Design a protein with these regions (language model features):
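An N-terminal assembly and electron-transfer interface module characteristic of large anaerobic redox
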Residues: 1-228
Length: 228
């Protein structure tokens, strides 16, 4: 996505003005200044732009706070990992959250956990964390491993996202190395319709239910029968 504005700019003729503002959150007041830059494209009124910014931020903070509810259950939980633009868009993710709920499972999202907690657990990663998204996903990974809050992990990836190719592989490797929690990587672009997506999701759900029903089962394979 980083190169998309330049690709469009130099490959499509007679374009209107592109909104190509760099968002840098390192400095405290940068976001407001950057939103002013965007706002001036539409209206030359600083007061209205600032009011719109604060209103939008208040709505965003409110919606985000609703996600950070305390966990009621520590069973039947599945975490869905991936970029917010995939997890929040029910068209892109093929309504996966509703499908999990219908199957009797609770879904968790990385946004439900406090940033301070994820920062603490992200430090357990031995390598260098390059992006905030990487920090969020690897922090969620280590937090879930220690707290044992979930029975399954689903990572929704977009084929065109280069960051996903690094983050998803790192998360999967750490999960498989440190625990036996089932992990499934679903690349949403691989499925032209819901058929293939649903088949993989249903198989994953069935496997979770089978594990729970048979967690105390010990196979008799290899035992001898003695008769007299």
């Amino acid at each position: 996505f980083c190169g998309l504005p330049e690709m469009i700019k130099y490959s499509v003729k007679d374009l209107p003005k592109l909104i190509n503002t760099k968002i840098d959150l390192v400095k405290k007041d940068n976001l407001l200044n950057q939103m002013l830059e965007v706002g001036y494209i539409f209206i030359n009124d600083k007061k209205r732009i600032v009011e719109a910014y604060h209103k939008a931020k208040a709505i965003y903070d409110y919606e985000k706070s609703k996600l950070k509810l305390p966990l009621v259950n520590k069973t039947n939980n599945v975490v869905i990992m991936g970029h917010p633009y995939v997890l929040s868009d029910d068209y892109l993710n093929m309504n996966i959250k509703a499908k999990l709920k219908k199957a009797g499972l609770n879904y968790l999202l990385p946004e439900m956990f406090d940033d301070d907690i994820l920062t603490k657990y992200a430090k357990q990663y031995n390598g260098k964390v390059f992006w905030y998204f990487f920090h969020q996903m690897i922090g969620t990974c280590f937090y879930l491993l220690e707290q044992k809050l979930v029975e399954g992990i689903i990572y929704l990836s977009s084929f065109g996202c280069g960051i996903d190719s690094v983050v998803a592989e790192t998360v999967e490797r750490n999960i498989r190395r440190n625990c036996d929690i089932p992990f499934m990587l679903l690349t949403i672009d691989e499925h032209s319709g819901e058929g293939g997506f649903n088949t993989r999701l249903e198989a994953f759900i069935d496997m979770l239910k089978w594990r729970k029903q048979n967690e105390n089962y010990i196979s008799p394979y290899g035992n001898y029968l003695y008769t007299r």
